[in-house]
């Protein structure tokens, strides 16, 4: 009996001394957030309001991808300017600084009458961007940045990630008829909105864990067609609907500022566009915060790198 008691005591002692070490809890790096900023000409000022409102909530991007007007704002943001600084810059900007001195209506008339490839070279826009990013190439900006353009010969999407920042933005923003195509390394490029109106899939391909897309495009039924420029933008809107739906399926959340009624070709409505961007973030903020919180929870997984 004593023998069995002694054996039991040894077993209990061994059990008490043996500790099961739980698997280590390894925290993954913070989720990479991307802003996918869509095209929309002068309505692109709404991107500034979106960025301002997100920054106020502590939400910033690691990756920025822009199409057309989105590439303009995106380049400035990736270079380190915050939303307020970009807005201040936009308030002191006039059309001549980015349109080579041509008004939009005059531009279209000149192009059609003279059969030109575009009445705006885009050099002023290129210089404006390079001046405000301090001449840094894309790969040297503070955040990962990409600008989306369309190869005019093949119709394929091209994603610029390195090289002259202003030139890439110029290519991404070269709306046909208004801007001349941009030649880079022997290839001609036009507005990226033809292939990726809201470049969410590109943001995802660059390693984003969470993509916040900003859609500033007009719905066709919301557009006036009172003149030739209106008809052109209406055509772009119709053309981009299907592509836009496909692109937005790659986003985790889509912010849609109310931009219908805002002119596509007049920068004078910039303050209203900024305000609409801020309002759009406020409307979707509860859902956005909930999704980000859920994403962060899943990154604290026991025993996983």
Residue ranges of predicted features:
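Gly/Ala-rich beta-loop-alpha elbow adjacent to hydrolase catalytic centers
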Residues: 66, 70
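Bacterial N-terminal signal peptides
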Residues: 5-15
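Patatin-like phospholipase
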Residues: 17-64, 76-305
């Amino acid at each position: 009996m004593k023998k069995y008691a002694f054996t039991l005591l040894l077993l209990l002692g061994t059990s008490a001394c043996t500790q099961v070490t739980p698997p280590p809890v390894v925290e993954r790096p913070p989720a990479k957030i991307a802003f996918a900023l869509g095209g929309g000409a002068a309505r692109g000022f709404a991107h500034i309001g979106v960025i301002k409102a997100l920054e106020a909530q502590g939400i910033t991007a690691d990756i920025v991808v822009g199409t057309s007007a989105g590439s303009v704002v995106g380049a400035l943001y990736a270079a380190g300017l915050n939303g307020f600084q970009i807005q201040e810059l936009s308030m002191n900007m006039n059309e001549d600084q980015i349109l080579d001195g041509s008004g939009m209506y005059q531009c279209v008339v000149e192009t059609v009458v003279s059969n030109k490839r575009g009445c705006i070279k885009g050099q002023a826009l290129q210089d404006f961007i390079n001046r405000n990013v301090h001449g840094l190439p894309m790969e040297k900006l503070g955040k990962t940045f990409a600008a989306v353009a369309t190869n005019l010969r093949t119709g394929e999407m091209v994603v610029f990630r390195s090289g002259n920042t202003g030139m890439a933005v110029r290519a991404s923003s070269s709306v046909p008829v208004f801007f001349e195509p941009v030649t880079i390394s022997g290839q001609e490029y036009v507005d990226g909105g033809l292939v990726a109106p809201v470049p969410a899939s590109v943001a995802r391909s660059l390693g984003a864990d969470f993509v916040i897309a900003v859609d500033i495009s007009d719905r066709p039924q919301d557009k006036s067609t009172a003149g030739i420029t209106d008809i052109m933008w209406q055509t772009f809107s119709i053309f981009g609907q299907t592509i836009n739906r496909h692109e937005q399926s790659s986003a985790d959340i889509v912010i849609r500022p109310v931009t219908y009624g805002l002119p596509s070709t007049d920068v004078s409505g910039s303050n209203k566009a900024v305000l609409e961007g801020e309002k759009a973030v406020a409307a979707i903020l509860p859902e956005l915060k909930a999704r980000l919180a859920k994403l962060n929870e899943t990154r604290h997984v026991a025993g996983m790198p």
